């Protein structure tokens, strides 16, 4: 029998339903794997007692025939999601030991459907980063290594703990958040599937805010079908989030395996950028061939404002972050550093409580929102954002069903390799992903191959608003044609 932790979420669901094993047995297997994988630093908090209690409840419900769609399935939760009575810090020192008295809407949906909480997963501080190196708990180490090289690699960010945990078989699936690529980029770096749904598809209530007009929750999974199962549970209308859209959630699982014959797939010429590696270019061409062989029509398209997306994003996102993070003052919750008066206390608390990357983004955001520069930077960036959205609207109006692009400009890089370099070099990791957030569209990253030195490479599919089903159908075609890419050597177990 396949090791319990190696089962896909879909296989685990079937095994539980058929009584082949219990949720307690499955949960214990994951808890043991988590214990052996602490060198990866994927979890910032393990919750074994809660997990086993939830698993026992699931087993009772399974025995009585009252099962939910995720009954008994052990999941990891990114530390950006508030979990009632369970420490939630956004991996920031300023929120050290914060224990929320409420549950995020997304996680409450997962518990409603029977899922089991294994623990809280590491991420970049306040989700600001592309490598999971800015966390107050230290960097996450990718379960992947280059062939013949023991250099520790980043799992991507900001949802690096989620990606690493799913890839290393430390949970059956995980939640992530995506503001500029924080689900899709780590998914591509770790050989996992990650989807950022349409803005408004999942509630943001109870998720620590980074950039409110860009943030969106989504799942990580080992297969396209598993991601579809998770998104169905996570999504849904929530009156507590004014940006959450009141429309029915489709059965995404039904879309997996559906025919893509006649679907029109756009290849944007602007994404062929200077310095893009030959292997990424070849992977992109092969991905288009996979879709064409399955009956899709491949067409060249133009998204002319793509070149302005990254600079516009790095104005809009820090501006919103500086506003959202103004609430962390040391008075109401979290870390507090004393001062002679209230102003000095604020200054000391924020200087000590925020890491360098978060401080950088707050300063950029405050600068671009200042009276003298608002029109020159922030207002202009918002105009560019409108033009990016218009580019996609025009392409979709021409009958294009989805857009195929690379997910990242390179495979994973070494820990420390880019963190100390020019920050712009790190920001360039998001070059293929930020347009999706700026336009509020759904995007999925799916593993499509391995680099010359044996690291995962992913492709990205971008869809029309609220047409995630199309993305699942197309991603499954790539998954079937390219194969899956599990981590083959579990070096962290010694």
Swiss-Prot record:
GO terms for cellular component: glutamyl-tRNA(Gln) amidotransferase complex. One of its GO terms (molecular function) is ATP binding. Its EC number is 6.3.5.7. The active site is at residues 78, 158, 182. NCBIfam families: gatA. One of its GO terms (biological process) is translation. Allows the formation of correctly charged Gln-tRNA(Gln) through the transamidation of misacylated Glu-tRNA(Gln) in organisms which lack glutaminyl-tRNA synthetase. The reaction takes place in the presence of glutamine and ATP through an activated gamma-phospho-Glu-tRNA(Gln). It comes from the Bacteria. HAMAP family: GatA. This is Glutamyl-tRNA(Gln) amidotransferase subunit A. Heterotrimer of A, B and C subunits.
């Amino acid at each position: 029998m396949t090791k319990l932790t190696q089962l896909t979420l879909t296989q685990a669901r079937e095994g539980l339903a058929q009584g082949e094993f219990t949720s307690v047995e499955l949960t214990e297997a994951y808890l043991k794997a988590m214990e052996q994988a602490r060198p990866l630093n994927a979890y910032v908090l393990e919750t074994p007692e809660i997990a086993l209690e939830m698993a026992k409840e699931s087993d009772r419900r399974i025995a009585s025939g009252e099962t939910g769609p995720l009954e008994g399935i052990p999941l990891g939760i990114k530390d950006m999601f508030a979990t009632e009575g369970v420490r939630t810090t956004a991996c920031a020192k300023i929120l050290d030991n914060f224990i929320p008295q409420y549950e995020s809407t997304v996680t409450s949906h997962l518990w409603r459907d029977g899922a089991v909480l294994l623990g809280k997963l590491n991420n970049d501080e306040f989700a600001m980063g592309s490598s999971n190196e800015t966390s107050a708990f230290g960097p996450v180490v990718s379960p992947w290594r280059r062939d013949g090289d023991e250099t520790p690699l980043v799992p991507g960010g900001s949802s690096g703990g989620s990606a690493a945990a799913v890839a290393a078989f430390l949970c059956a699936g995980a939640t992530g958040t995506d503001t500029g690529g924080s689900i899709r980029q780590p998914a591509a770096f770790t050989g996992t599937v990650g989807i950022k749904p349409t803005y408004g598809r999942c509630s943001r209530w109870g998720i620590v805010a980074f950039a409110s007009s860009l943030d969106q929750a989504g799942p990580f999974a080992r297969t396209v079908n598993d991601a579809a199962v998770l998104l169905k549970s996570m999504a849904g209308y929530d009156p507590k989030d004014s940006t959450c859209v009141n429309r029915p959630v489709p059965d995404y699982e039904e879309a997996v395996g559906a025919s893509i014959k006649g679907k029109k797939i756009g290849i944007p010429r602007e994404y062929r950028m200077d310095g893009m590696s030959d292997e990424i270019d070849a992977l992109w061409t092969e991905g288009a061939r996979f879709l064409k062989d399955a009956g899709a029509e491949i067409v060249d398209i133009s998204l002319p404002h793509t070149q302005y997306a990254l600079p516009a994003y790095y104005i809009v996102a820090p501006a919103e972050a500086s506003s959202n993070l103004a609430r962390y003052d040391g008075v109401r919750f979290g870390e507090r550093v004393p001062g002679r008066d209230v102003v000095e206390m604020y200054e000391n608390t924020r200087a000590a409580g925020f890491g360098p990357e978060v401080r950088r983004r707050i300063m950029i955001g405050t600068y671009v929102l200042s009276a003298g520069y608002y029109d020159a930077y922030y207002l202009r960036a918002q105009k560019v954002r409108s033009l990016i959205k218009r580019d996609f609207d025009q392409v979709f109006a021409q009958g294009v069903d989805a857009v195929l692009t690379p997910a990242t400009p390179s495979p994973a890089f070494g820990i420390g390799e880019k963190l100390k370099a020019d920050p712009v070099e790190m920001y360039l990791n998001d070059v293929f992903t930020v347009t999706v957030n700026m336009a509020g569209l759904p995007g999925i990253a799916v593993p499509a191959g391995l680099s010359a030195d044996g690291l995962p490479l992913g492709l990205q599919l971008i869809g029309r608003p609220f047409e995630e089903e199309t993305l699942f159908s197309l991603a499954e075609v790539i998954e079937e044609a390219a194969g899956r890419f599990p981590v083959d050597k579990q070096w962290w177990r010694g």
